[in-house]
């Protein structure tokens, strides 16, 4: 069985192979994911697991959250996440069960979803990798400006979705096909090759790679 789990980005480091090759890895802490609800085709129209992880102070829990956790008999966590299930997945998992990183023991590659680091308002050069204009040759004001953003009277407007300056980052990003380098069951750690979205301590959704 290989369904998605919720983890926390610990940071990056490197490990060495027996041949002395350095591999950059991201360390993800995948503490116990407690099942708070099992959604079925009959009651919800689709199959999914709702899970929580971590802890949350009692004075930070809203009454609806408290009722939901009490109904499931699960300790309140720092949030609620939902993981879709395909046919045949998650059979036998009940409310209150705890899922751990060992379910990735036989998984070669994973997709990791997180919220990218926010960069604030940025121009086209940084946000979209536009090339800069001439530094000299009569250009004194438009070194990093976008340049032309459209045509003339026809169509007489700027098309929607045009790449321009604006808010960069702080959006949901998925990095696909990250190689699983190591699964540390004792310390609840998952080591994947390369970088994952988001800052240190950010929440991540780890799923088996769909394109592996």
From Swiss-Prot:
Question: What modifications does the entry list under PTM / processing?
Answer: Methylated by PrmB.
Compositional bias segments (type: Polar residues): 136-155
Segment Disordered: which positions? 136-157
Give the top-rank taxon of the lineage listed in the UniProt record for this protein: Bacteria
GO terms for cellular component: cytosolic large ribosomal subunit
- Which terms are listed as keywords in the entry? Methylation, Ribonucleoprotein, Ribosomal protein, RNA-binding, rRNA-binding
What is an annotated GO biological process for this record, any one?
A: translation
What Pfam families does its record include? Ribosomal_L3 (PF00297)
Q: Which GO terms describe its molecular function?
A: rRNA binding; structural constituent of ribosome
Q: Which residues carry this modification: N5-methylglutamine?
A: 153
Q: Which family does it belong to?
A: Belongs to the universal ribosomal protein uL3 family.
Function description: One of the primary rRNA binding proteins, it binds directly near the 3'-end of the 23S rRNA, where it nucleates assembly of the 50S subunit.
Which HAMAP family does the entry link to? Ribosomal_uL3_B (MF_01325_B)
What is the name attached to this protein's record?
A: Large ribosomal subunit protein uL3
What organism is recorded for this protein? Shewanella sp. (strain W3-18-1)
Gene that encodes it? rplC
């Amino acid at each position: 069985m290989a369904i998605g789990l919720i983890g926390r980005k610990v940071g990056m480091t490197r490990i060495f192979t027996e041949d002395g090759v350095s591999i950059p890895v991201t360390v993800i802490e995948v503490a116990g994911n407690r099942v708070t609800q099992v959604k079925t085709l009959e009651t919800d129209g689709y199959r999914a697991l709702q899970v929580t992880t971590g802890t949350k102070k009692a004075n930070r829990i809203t009454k609806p959250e408290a009722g939901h956790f009490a109904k499931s008999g699960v300790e309140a966590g720092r949030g609620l996440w939902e993981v879709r299930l395909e046919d045949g997945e998650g059979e036998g998992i009940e409310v209150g069960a705890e899922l751990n990183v060992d379910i990735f023991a036989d998984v070669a590659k994973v997709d990791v979803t997180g919220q990218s680091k926010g960069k604030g308002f940025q121009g086209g050069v940084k946000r979209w990798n536009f090339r800069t204009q001439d530094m000299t040759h009569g250009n004194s004001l438009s070194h990093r400006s976008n340049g032309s953003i459209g045509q003339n009277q026809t169509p007489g407007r700027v098309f929607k979705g045009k790449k321009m300056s604006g808010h960069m980052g702080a959006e949901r990003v998925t990095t696909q096909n990250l190689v699983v380098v190591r699964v540390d069951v004792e310390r609840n750690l998952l080591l994947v090759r390369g970088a994952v979205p988001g800052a240190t301590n950010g929440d991540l959704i780890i799923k088996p790679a769909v394109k592996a």
